[in-house]
C-alpha cells in the first residue's frame, strides 16, 4: 500500500508498513481518504534532520487521530530511522500519536523506538530535497509556505481483502 503526497514542491510517494504499524497506517490512510491533510503546511523544516506536517491548525500543536484522541506507539525493533525518507508519527511523549507526521532527511538513530515508523519514501526524493533547501525562520517554519495540496491513495493489488 502506498500514497502520494501532492505538495506545492512536487510529489512524494510513500510506501506504508501496514503489517508493522497497522494502527498508525489505518489512522494515516483514513485521514488521507477524508482529505484531512489537504492544505496542511510543512510547519517545521530542519535541514539534515526532518520536515513535519499533518496539523490542520498550522500551529504545530494541533491535529487529531481518527479515534478523536491519541493512540499508542507501535515499535518494531527491525524498523530503524536509518536513511533519508523515513516516515514516522510525530508525538510529544509515549503513546501520544494523533495526525502529525515527519519525514527524515538523513539517518536519525536517536528516534528509533521513540517515534512510530510507519513508512518510507519510495519516489519524490527530488521534491524532498527541494523542501529541505527552503529557507526557514528562527522557529524552523519555511519562509515560503509549503503544503500538501492533496493525497492519492494507491491500492496494492497483492494485498488481501
Swiss-Prot record:
* This protein's UniProt keywords: Isomerase, Rotamase
Q: Name one GO biological process term.
A: protein folding
What CDD domains does the annotation carry? Cyclophilin_PPIL3_like
Q: So what EC number does this one have?
A: 5.2.1.8
Looking at the UniProt record for this protein, which Gene Ontology cellular component terms does it annotate, in alphabetical order? catalytic step 2 spliceosome
UniProt keyword Isomerase present: yes
The record's top EC class is isomerase
Question: Is Secreted there in the keyword field?
Answer: no
Disulphide bridges, residue numbers? none
Classification via Pfam families = Pro_isomerase
Q: In what residue span(s) does the PPIase cyclophilin-type domain sit?
A: 1-153
Reaction(s) the record says it catalyses: [protein]-peptidylproline (omega=180) = [protein]-peptidylproline (omega=0)
Domain of life of the organism encoding this protein: Eukaryota
Query: Which terms in the Gene Ontology molecular function aspect does this entry carry?
Result: peptidyl-prolyl cis-trans isomerase activity
User: What does the function comment of this entry state?
Assistant: PPIases accelerate the folding of proteins. It catalyzes the cis-trans isomerization of proline imidic peptide bonds in oligopeptides.
Which PANTHER family does the protein's record reference?
Answer: PEPTIDYL-PROLYL CIS-TRANS ISOMERASE-LIKE 3 (PTHR45625:SF2), PEPTIDYL-PROLYL CIS-TRANS ISOMERASE-RELATED (PTHR45625)
The family classification in the record reads: Belongs to the cyclophilin-type PPIase family. PPIL3 subfamily.
User: What is the name of the protein in this document?
Assistant: Peptidyl-prolyl cis-trans isomerase 10
